[in-house]
Amino acid sequence: GSIAVVIVLIILLRMYANRYTKVGPNEVMVISGRQHRTMEGRAVGFRIVKGGGTFVWPIFEKADILSLELMTLDVRLKEVYTITGVSVNVDGVAQVKIKGEDQAIRTAAERFLGRSEEEIKMIALQTVEGHLRGIVGTLTIEDIYKNRDAFAQKVQEVSAGDLANM
């Protein structure tokens, strides 16, 4: 009798220990499979754990990890045309990351969960490149070279909106 109870308790403790999942401070765990309410009261099919741990119910839930690390994008555009029709090559670096705020994490989970870091980088890079092409097309070559800081600021401002919606 009591040996059976002890064995059952050990099995339950092991199951709990095996299903308790943790993430570091630079990661978010997205647990999907059951309905949860957001702080705003909206029903969603997942819950979020930032830098901690939680029990993931076997069979009913699945845990995925989303990185909050800074990602560096190497931007290299060839033959981008300015407003005057002059072809220029544009090289630069952009740094992007998923914000640690709940709404930004929910949005990123809906867009990127299950994708590799390389796939996420490629999507962000294509977004930045598209905006970069559009901005270069509105400037002269003199504007680009004389006002590099203003040019970089404009690229950041225009890209930020689309990147935030990802």
Q: At which residue positions do the language-model features occur?
A:
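N-terminal hydrophobic membrane-entry segments
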Residues: 1-166
